[in-house]
Regions:
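NAD(P)-dependent dehydrogenase/reductase Rossmann-like domain
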Residues: 252, 265, 273-388
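Glycine-rich Rossmann-fold phosphate-binding loop(s) that bind the pyrophosphate
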Residues: 145-146
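N-terminal Rossmann-fold NAD(P) dinucleotide-binding loop
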Residues: 149-150
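Hydrophobic Val/Ile/Leu positions in short beta-strands of Rossmann-like dinucleotide-binding domains
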Residues: 4-6, 142, 322
Length: 388
């Protein structure tokens, strides 16, 4: 039995997945094998030595100390695509709000309440002040064509928009899901120059911090309407407000409110609603639970943010899994120790991600703990697991 500690409210369907696999689940575990979280902040957490993995029911992992987890041999998983429909639907709503001043229009109508019978006439007289253009026939630029970006691009086509997409890391799976009518752009400046609307679906990293800034705003088609449902720090707020003031940016709709943006003209802030639907929470919880169970039971890695993805069907009597430095000679060392135990390797898999590698050996017999300790003593080996 594996012990799973929850650190946030997790959808019941996700907990049911774990319980069906005979896992003990509780928010009070003292020495868990895995953590299942949503937004719990772990940067100051002390991890117990038994902790093998962390499942994030969602996409963003800035609440998890990724480098420290890697150094301690802890796999970190997220759930890409599980909330994609939820975010896509909200973004389509935001697309219209970026065109028409719907928020301002509703507030204006509510302000007319004291006028009583005069309201219909006042509405007809003043409605042009909050009018805006159609999205049909306009061009939407999509930066990042993964699970969410590809769905947004395809949906925008159904609104009779023209769509350009930019993603230098486009995966084969995402490409298959993308309509052939989406124009693939390889120069980001072309996107800025030709699009009327812009939406981003990329991760927040040191490289993407202030991805949109004074320099990029200056390259945009005047009157650009920008949607940010990815991460707030992708946009330089000071430069954005200056671009709105000058008219270079017509409107900004974001799911990440802050003190600089709330209440500003032509800025619409949502209260981080992107993945806040019962369906998305259930999908994320179920997906994270399955990733955790597959890793704990089989050593398979799916959707890890710090280790290479590595999956191998169980083909031997026993399985050995190792997290180690990606350097020459490691596999030979492991194989020597396995052979010394008079055990044969039936199947193996070795995957790398930068400086980190992950290796699975399926063997004819179970190695003894002495062999595992020998491997743990090899410089550069972070974690050794013997699975039945």
């Amino acid at each position: 039995m594996f012990n799973i500690k929850t650190m946030n409210a997790i959808a019941e369907k996700g907990l049911d997945e774990l319980k069906a696999e005979k896992c003990a689940v509780s928010p009070e575990m003292s020495a868990p094998d895995a953590l299942l979280i949503r937004s719990a902040k772990l940067h100051d957490a002390v991890f117990n030595k038994e902790l093998l993995c962390i499942g994030r029911a969602g996409i963003g992992v800035d609440n998890i100390p990724i480098e420290r987890c890697t150094a301690e041999g802890i796999a970190v998983f997220n759930t890409p695509g599980a909330n994609a429909d939820s975010v896509k639907e909200l973004l389509l709503c935001a697309l219209t709000m970026a065109s028409r001043d719907i928020v301002g229009a509703v507030e204006w109508v509510e302000s007319l309440a004291p006028e009583g019978e005069k309201i219909p006439a006042l509405v007809e007289k003043g409605k042009n002040a909050v009018a805006g253009p159609e999205v049909s026939g306009k061009r939407l630029g999509v930066i990042g064509l993964g699970a969410i970006g590809s769905r947004v691009a395809n949906a925008a086509l159904k609104l009779d928009m023209e769509v350009s997409g930019y993603d230098p890391y486009l995966s084969v799976d995402s490409a298959w899901n993308l309509s052939s009518k989406v124009e693939h752009v390889t120069d980001l400046n072309v996107l800025f120059r030709t699009c009327d609307y812009l939406t981003m679906h990329i991760h927040s990293t040191p490289e993407t911090f202030h991805y949109l800034n004074a320099e990029t705003f200056a390259k945009m088609k005047p009157g650009m309407r920008i949607l940010n449902f990815a991460r707030g720090e992708l946009v330089d707020d000071d430069a954005l407000l200056a671009a709105i003031e000058s008219g270079q940016v017509a409107r900004y709709v974001t799911d990440f409110p802050n003190a600089k943006l709330v209440g500003k003209k032509n800025v619409v802030c949502f209260p981080h609603l992107g993945a806040t639907t019962p369906e998305a929470e259930e999908k994320c919880a179920v997906m994270a639970a399955r990733e955790i169970v597959d890793y704990l039971r089989n050593g398979n890695i799916r959707n890890s943010v710090n280790l290479p993805n590595a999956t191998l069907d169980r083909l031997g009597k026993s399985r050995l899994c190792l997290i180690h430095r990606n350097q020459p000679g490691m596999l030979n060392r492991f194989l020597e120790i396995i052979a010394a135990g008079n055990v044969n390797v039936e199947h193996m898999l070795n995957k790398a991600r930068g400086e980190i590698a992950y290796t699975i050996f399926d063997t004819t017999e179970r190695l003894d703990e002495t062999a595992a300790e020998e491997m743990r003593a090899i410089p550069g080996v972070t974690r050794v697991r013997l699975l039945g």
